[in-house]
């Protein structure tokens, strides 16, 4: 399980060092093999351990292919997916096209989302975090299924 928001930096080549607290789990789960693709909803990237991504692919493959919205989602997620591997220093290279999509420069945030990470531009992350907090505090903003969640 991946949790927490981690400030990370991309070097001049677009490499990012995976925080050390996640490296052992990624090494044991998937030998450091990752898939990075766009997030179809938010302006960020999703970084999956290979075993998690294979489950996503199976679900996408099972969708009826004659529905345009299914094909659209498949094109976005699978068409932008890139296989990556952590190097000996625990780094991975974010391809230029994906860096452009998420507007990643030097400062970024790697945010654990249980089964995957989201990779955000730091300023975009700060803005969406503030907006999310403001939205959830509005009366009636909490969905019914979350009202009974014990935190």
Curated annotation (Swiss-Prot):
Alphabetical UniProt keywords: Cytoplasm, DNA-binding, Repeat, Transcription, Transcription regulation
Domain of life: Bacteria
Occurrences of domain SpoVT-AbrB (ranges): 5-52, 81-124
Keyword Cell membrane: no
A cellular component term, taken from the record's GO annotations: nucleoid
Pfam families found in the cross-reference section: MraZ (PF02381)
Gene Ontology MF annotations: DNA-binding transcription factor activity; transcription cis-regulatory region binding
Subcellular location: Cytoplasm, Nucleoid
One GO biological process term: negative regulation of DNA-templated transcription initiation
InterPro entries: MraZ, MraZ_C, MraZ_dom, MraZ_N, MraZ_sf, SpoVT-AbrB_dom, SpoVT-AbrB_sf
HAMAP family hit by this protein: MraZ (MF_01008)
The protein's assembly and partners: Forms oligomers.
Record-given protein name: Transcriptional regulator MraZ
């Amino acid at each position: 399980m991946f949790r927490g928001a981690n400030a990370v930096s991309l070097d001049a080549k677009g490499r990012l060092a995976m925080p050390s607290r996640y490296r052992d789990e990624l090494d044991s789960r998937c030998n450091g093999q990752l898939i990075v693709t766009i997030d179809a909803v938010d302006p960020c990237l999703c970084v999956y351990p290979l075993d998690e991504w294979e489950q996503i692919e199976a679900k996408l493959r099972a969708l009826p292919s004659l529905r345009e919205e299914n094909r659209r989602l498949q094109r976005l997620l699978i068409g932008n997916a890139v296989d990556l591997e952590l190097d000996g220093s625990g780094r991975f290279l974010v391809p230029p096209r994906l860096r452009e999509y998420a507007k990643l420069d030097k400062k970024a945030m790697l945010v654990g989302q249980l089964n995957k990470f989201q990779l955000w531009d730091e300023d975009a992350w700060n803005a969406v975090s503030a907006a999310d907090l403001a939205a959830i505090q509005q009366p009636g903003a909490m969905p019914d299924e979350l009202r009974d969640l014990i935190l």
